[in-house]
Amino acid sequence: VGAFTPSLFKVSAGLGMQEAGIRLSTEMFFESVPDEYVDVSLEKWHFDEDARVIPIIIPRNYLNLYNFGFAQSRSLPKLSEGLMSLVQMDIMMRGNGRMEQYKGNIVGFSNRLNTILVPQSFMDWANKNFAPEKEAEPSRLIVEVKNPTDTAITDYFQQKNYETEGNNLDAGKTTYFLRLITAI
């Protein structure tokens, strides 16, 4: 079992093209998980406070939503993963009477984790510096099981009223059903 650690401070991100006078900004959040649950290369997945650059992993479906929904409906160009990895975001963090700007680099796209991920080392450092009076409680859990088609898992989660993300329990049931059919 792994825990998601939430950011306990305010975060905003911006990007734009100064030459064109375009600037986009939004409030956002970060979460982190232990490295062993990250499903992309860890080669660029480290935080160095002195470098002032935050590695970020976003869900692949965010890029797909942009490319096949927003961009397509507005005749905008699609963005590749390679191009997105070249974009640097301006990240503003606020809390504990501090306001600091860092750069954010997208270093990967997750198929499994539906959140805006930063390294655990960054999250621990940032929560300590921007929200020292708060204790970061896990916001969600990652549960890895040997056999996701085991109905006891589904039953247990339903009895406890636990929510699962992405209907993974239903996918397990479907796999079980297909195995049952192919065995007949």
Locate the predicted segments by residue.
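Basic-flanked hydrophobic alpha-helices used for secretion and membrane insertion
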Residues: 1, 9-13, 38-49, 54-162
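Hydrophobic, regular-secondary-structure patches
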Residues: 1-30
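Short amphipathic alpha-helical patches
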Residues: 14-17, 86, 177-181
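Domain-start "cap" segments at the beginnings of catalytic or binding domains
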Residues: 23-24, 34-41
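Short, basic, helix/turn surface patches
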Residues: 29-33, 184
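Pocket-edge structural micro-motifs
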Residues: 32, 60, 166
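Peri-transmembrane interface segments
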Residues: 147-184
